């Protein structure tokens, strides 16, 4: 599943080419993905100008000029591919489920073989009350994510720290890949009880502080590298993510330790 760096990579690619443009048509090639598409989604997106493209956790928030937001989650295998015009978009592939044509001729195609993605239309500003976003924790690259806030979230957790960091209610956007890398760099065992990590706050270089520092560092490096391509992730221009070449632990079982 695309994690925060991969979704941010997609966001940046879409924003570069689509932000400020107007949608001329939308073609839905099935009735939904993980859930049915919103009623009249084609009509509601057509002739709308894209004001901005934001991200919350692993969700894309495409802001439209009618005060609505097109919410997109890529699921396990969802991806957007951009084409400059019809001459580049030669034929519709088997799993191309949503085709967006822009007034300037550009085409954005959403492809999702496993169909675990999600699309919805919501009122801009009301996303915090949406059933998929209401309980999501703070953004790990924000100032709100610090040793104190992390400690407070972990203090009563009896689960392993790895499990806790995967909980989207504690911190947004992390998945198995990046939690493994973060804990390795922070020198914290993934099996350590989350509450014991919280209890170290106040000591010199607490475990929470190390986790926060390494979270921000790993995510920043991963975004700069275009995310991680394990199987089928690609940016909107087809480029692969190269942070996978920097893995110290994920997918390296049985190989020499790099720590």
List each model region and its residues.
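Phosphate/anion-contacting hairpin/loop surfaces
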Residues: 70-187, 197-201
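Alpha-helical structural motif
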Residues: 3-6, 10, 19, 37, ...
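Basic, nucleic-acid-binding surfaces and adjacent catalytic neighborhoods in DNA/RNA-processing proteins
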Residues: 22-40, 54, 88, 151-259
């Amino acid at each position: 599943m695309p994690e925060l760096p991969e979704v941010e990579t997609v966001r940046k690619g879409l924003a570069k080419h689509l932000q400020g443009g107007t949608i001329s048509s939308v073609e839905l090639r099935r009735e939904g993905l993980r859930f049915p598409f919103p009623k009249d989604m084609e009509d509601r997106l057509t002739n709308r100008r894209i004001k901005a493209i934001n991200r919350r956790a692993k969700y894309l928030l495409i802001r439209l000029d009618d005060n609505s937001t097109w919410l997109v989650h890529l699921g396990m295998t969802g991806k957007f591919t951009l084409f400059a015009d019809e001459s580049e978009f030669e034929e519709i592939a088997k799993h191309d489920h949503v085709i967006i044509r822009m007034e300037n001729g550009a085409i954005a195609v959403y492809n999702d073989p496993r169909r675990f993605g999600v699309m919805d239309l919501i009122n801009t500003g009301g996303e915090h009350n949406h059933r998929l976003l209401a309980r999501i924790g703070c953004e790990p690259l924000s100032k709100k994510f610090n040793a104190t806030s992390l400690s407070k979230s972990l203090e009563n957790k009896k689960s392993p720290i790895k499990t806790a960091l995967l909980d989207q209610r504690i911190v947004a956007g992390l998945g198995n890949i990046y939690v493994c890398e973060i804990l390795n760099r922070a020198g914290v065992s993934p099996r350590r009880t989350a509450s014991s990590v919280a209890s170290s706050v106040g000591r010199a270089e607490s475990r929470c502080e190390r986790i926060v520092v390494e979270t921000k560092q790993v995510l920043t490096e991963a975004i700069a590298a275009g995310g991680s391509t394990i199987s089928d992730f690609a940016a909107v221009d087809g480029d692969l993510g190269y942070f996978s070449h920097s893995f110290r632990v994920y997918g390296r079982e049985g190989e020499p330790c790099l720590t």
